[in-house]
Regions:
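A structural signal for short, well-ordered beta-strand segments and their strand-loop junctions
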Residues: 38-39, 88-92, 117-118, 159, ...
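Short, solvent-exposed loop/turn segments at secondary-structure junctions
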Residues: 11-13, 44-45, 61-62, 95-97, ...
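A conserved donor-nucleotide-binding helix/loop in the catalytic core
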Residues: 59-91, 99, 189-198
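C-terminal catalytic/acceptor-binding lobe
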Residues: 196-278
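Catalytic core and acceptor-binding pocket of nucleotide-sugar-dependent glycosyltransferases
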Residues: 141-233
Length: 278
């Protein structure tokens, strides 16, 4: 029987999602496998902590965006326990497992050279790489030129064999600390780092469709196996991230549309001409 480490961070307001996550993933996710839940939280107690498979780990809440950038370091605090398991998977707090997901459809396939498991980000599943929101800042360790990259993956569900996942965490934690020292914040934080790592290891991961990362209320041609719950129905997301709302002018909207829909063609041609690479 394969052993699965379920890595879950729920600090602050995100603890509201834990009960439904536990209930649906215990019932539907990888039946026949032994699941161990590692819950990193600042809550003094959580639901189901009496279950021997639930391990509550004290974790102070970081301010935004360190709360996402520091994920790899958080996981590594439990390295000795995690390396004893066969597979490790990280899940965003607001996920719920709607359908039964079998090991055959989800786990990496070693016979095909796969050690990691990644999921397509639903906003980009049908777009060309030049339109992906990779980090384009050459000063950032997550930088990807416009002429590079193959897939755009979600930062909120990923994993693999314990050895491969922990090796990835160590490398991405090193890069994150380098960015922090240099005063650089990746565009989408841990997700930008994950996409750079995927671009460097294109044959090393199993890529799942957005069926396994299906935002609540969206309409896509995929089954709804793992649902991403709308956080704004539970708390003020902008307040948690210390974001303020700004009204954009007509000219700003037009410029943003140009940058999103047309500018990538020019930048991709430039990077090809300059023969940029990872």
């Amino acid at each position: 029987m394969a052993t699965i480490g379920m890595l879950y961070i729920c600090t602050g307001k995100y603890t509201v999602f834990w009960p439904e996550f536990y209930e649906t993933f215990s019932r539907n996710f990888l039946p026949g496998c032994k699941k161990e839940y590692f819950i990193f939280t600042d809550a003094p107690s959580i639901a189901y902590e009496d279950d021997p498979a639930v391990h509550r780990i004290d974790q102070p809440a970081y301010d935004w965006p360190l709360s996402t950038m520091k994920r790899f370091a958080i996981f590594l605090t439990q390295e000795k326990a995690l390396e004893q398991l066969d597979y490790l998977f990280f899940f965003n707090a607001n996920l719920t497992c709607r359908e039964v997901i079998t090991p055959e459809e989800f786990l990496p396939r070693p016979q095909q050279g796969e050690q990691l498991l990644l999921v397509q980000q639903p906003g980009f599943w049908n777009k060309k790489p030049m339109f992906y929101s990779y980090d384009r800042n050459p000063r950032c360790t997550a930088y990807i030129p416009y002429n590079c990259g193959r897939d755009y993956v979600s930062g909120g569900l990923n994993g693999g064999t314990s050895a491969a996942f922990l090796a990835m965490c160590k490398e991405l934690d090193r890069r994150t600390e380098q960015d922090i020292r240099n005063g650089v914040v990746p565009l989408w934080h841990d997700e930008s780092q994950l996409n750079r790592y995927a671009a460097e290891h294109p044959g090393n991961y199993r890529l799942l469709t957005p069926a396994y990362w299906y935002p609540e209320g969206w309409q896509m041609p995929f089954e709804q196996k793992i649902i991403v719950r709308n956080k704004s129905r539970y708390f003020d997301v902008a307040a948690v991230k210390h974001h303020s709302q700004h009204t954009r002018s007509w000219l700003q909207c037009k410029w943003e549309a140009f940058c999103e829909n047309y500018l990538p063609y020019l930048l991709c041609a430039r990077d090809k001409l300059l023969q940029k690479h990872l």
